[in-house]
């Protein structure tokens, strides 16, 4: 696997994230498309906290609206982080925020949609899958990565195949989109490569805590490094179970230069902090961040 890396653009840091110079985030290439090595996540917009219903509802109250999403998109776009991942076509209110952010910044956003498909081996199941893919295409997605809950129904571990997957990949190609897999199950990466399916990239859960990972961290690290195509990692902060500094730093220092880390945020300020942490990890330096608040903050926490 050849890893494509654009030129490094170091930050000219100052005290406090919001005042630092905003440079373009490093990029990679997937199926001929230039992508930032940080992808915009959507769990903290759509209400998938992985903690509980109360947290889910709080996210929805805060962020499932055009204004909040637009502010976060603009924060990412300030660093040319211009690729958004998630089941976007299933959340149509997102499009208003996307178009508003694009109009305001003059920068286009690449959509990486992860639709849930009916993979029943029946005429009606196929028609329903086609209707969903038509909706994804209409929404303007560049990449269409079949959701893990759909793709994993097709896995045959005995044969080391993903049954009937080429049919769905062809449906995606026929609609002018680049096919891939939202692969929570590590075997999806292995079987895609082994059988040379038209899978141009794969999502893979990867974090320093092993959160939601189906095998050991070391095993997934090996899968990522041996993958034939670039990997889009998700859950880098284990859904808030580790700090951004720990989670993001681990991810960028243990994947390849062609791979990506998906990072979601609750606010635009969090975007700026996360980008600074990521840039510091890539440049092997300490991130320049403001100290955390504390009831009696001592000098060591300044």
Where are these regions (language model features)?
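Short, Lys/Arg-enriched N-terminal segments with co-localized hydrophobic residues
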Residues: 2-19
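Active-site beta->alpha loop and helix N-cap motifs at the rims of alpha/beta catalytic domains
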Residues: 62-159
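Active-site beta-loop-alpha junctions enriched in small/polar residues
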Residues: 43-45, 89, 114-120, 149-151, ...
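Structured C-terminal cap/extension of enzyme domains
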Residues: 28-37, 56, 61, 67-85, ...
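Conserved, mostly hydrophobic/aromatic
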Residues: 40, 179, 231
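N-terminal amphipathic alpha-helix/helix-capping segment at the start of soluble metabolic enzymes
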Residues: 20-43, 47-52
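Active-site-adjacent beta->alpha loops and helix N-cap segments on the catalytic face
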Residues: 90-104, 152-168, 186, 212-221, ...
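Glycine-enriched alpha-helix->loop->beta-strand junction motifs that scaffold or abut catalytic
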Residues: 139-142, 173-175, 194-203, 226-230, ...
């Amino acid at each position: 696997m050849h890893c494509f890396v654009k030129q490094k653009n170091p930050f000219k840091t100052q005290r406090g994230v919001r005042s630092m110079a905003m440079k373009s985030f490093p990029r990679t290439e997937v199926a001929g498309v230039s992508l930032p090595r940080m992808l915009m996540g959507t769990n903290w917009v759509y209400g998938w906290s992985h903690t509980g219903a109360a947290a889910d509802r709080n996210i929805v109250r805060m962020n499932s609206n055009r204004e909040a999403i637009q502010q976060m998109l603009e924060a990412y776009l300030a660093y040319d982080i211009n690729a958004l991942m998630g089941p976007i076509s299933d959340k149509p209110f997102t499009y208003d925020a996307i178009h508003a952010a694009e109009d305001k910044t003059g920068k286009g956003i690449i959509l990486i949609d992860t639709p849930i498909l009916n993979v029943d081996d029946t005429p009606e199941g196929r028609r329903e899958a086609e209707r969903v893919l038509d909706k994804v295409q209409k929404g303007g997605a560049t990449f269409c990565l079949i959701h893990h809950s759909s793709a994993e129904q097709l896995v045959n571990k005995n044969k080391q195949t993903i049954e009937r997957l080429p049919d769905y990949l062809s449906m995606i190609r026929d609609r002018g989109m680049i096919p891939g897999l939202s692969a929570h199950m590590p075997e999806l990466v292995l079987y895609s490569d082994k059988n040379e399916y038209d899978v141009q990239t794969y999502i893979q859960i990867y974090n320093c805590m092993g959160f939601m990972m189906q095998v050991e961290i070391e095993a997934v690290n090996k899968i990522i490094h041996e993958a034939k195509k670039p990997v889009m990692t998700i859950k880098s902060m284990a859904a808030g179970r580790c700090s951004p500094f720990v989670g993001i730093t681990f991810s960028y220092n243990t994947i390849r230069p062609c791979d990506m880390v998906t990072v979601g945020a609750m606010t635009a300020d969090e975007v700026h902090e996360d980008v600074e942490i990521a840039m510091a990890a890539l440049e092997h330096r300490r991130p320049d961040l403001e100290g955390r608040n504390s009831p009696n903050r001592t000098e060591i926490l300044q």
